[in-house]
């Protein structure tokens, strides 16, 4: 059997899935993630959820091609509608979507999450909005990681049940990411400083409020990166 090779960003998601988990992968596309995790023997079983017919059929085919029909059930469903409490799901992964959409998916199935011990979320934008939603709904970020793939930055959030308070700065930058200062984190926010500095150059001197706003954002990033002015 040929093992499924994950992209670096999905491999990062996989690394945070607990051993022995019963997994729901939302927006599973070709079911690459659950297939790889089962081939490694890391998880017990999985549901691959897809809301679009084409990727749903691709996932069905991939699961069959790998002989995993007894371990992975592919379901055509929207978000958390892909599982019921009786499925015994212990971990949910959601990757490849915006932070606001991930929050909407979680909100729509919030009552189903009581017995889910871990969420592994990889938004491709609006990470701060997702963190804010999680904090507002009594979820606790227990770890974070960041990588760059194909010139795009991906932040992964590892989330469990329990309340947590985060500052505005922690919501924006990530409590673990800003503390660990991984090379990809520094690269991401250094690029953001460059973009904001360019935008500042375009703002007329007389527009003091706009300039002050941009300068404040630049200053905050430099403070987090420990860069002198």
Sequence positions of predicted segments:
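Class I S-adenosyl-L-methionine
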Residues: 2-6, 100-229
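Short alpha-helix immediately C-terminal to the canonical SAM-binding loop
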Residues: 53-57
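S-adenosyl-L-methionine
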Residues: 1-20, 35, 60-86
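Short SAM/SAH-binding signature in class I
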Residues: 88-96
């Amino acid at each position: 059997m040929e093992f499924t090779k994950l992209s670096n960003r999905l491999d990062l998601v996989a690394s945070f899935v607990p051993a022995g988990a019963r997994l729901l992968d939302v927006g599973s596309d070709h079911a690459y993630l659950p297939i790889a995790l089962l081939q490694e023997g890391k998880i017990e079983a999985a549901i691959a959820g897809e809301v679009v017919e084409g990727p749903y059929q691709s996932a069905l085919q991939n699961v069959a091609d790998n002989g995993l029909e007894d371990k992975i059930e592919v379901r055509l469903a929207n978000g958390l509608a892909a599982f019921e409490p009786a499925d015994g799901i212990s971990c949910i992964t959601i990757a490849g979507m915006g932070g606001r959409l991930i929050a909407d998916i979680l909100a729509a199935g919030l009552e189903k999450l009581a017995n889910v011990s871990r969420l592994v979320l990889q938004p491709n934008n609006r990470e701060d909005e997702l963190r804010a939603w999680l904090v507002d709904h009594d979820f606790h970020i227990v770890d974070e990681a960041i990588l760059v793939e194909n010139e795009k930055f991906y932040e992964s959030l590892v989330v469990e049940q329990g309340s947590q308070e985060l500052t505005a700065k922690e919501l924006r930058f990530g409590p673990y990411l800003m503390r660990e200062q991984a090379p990809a984190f520094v690269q991401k926010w250094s690029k953001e400083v460059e973009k904001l500095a360019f935008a500042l150059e375009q703002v007329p001197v007389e527009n003091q409020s706009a300039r002050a706003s941009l300068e404040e954002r630049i200053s905050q990033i430099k403070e987090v990166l420990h860069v002198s002015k």
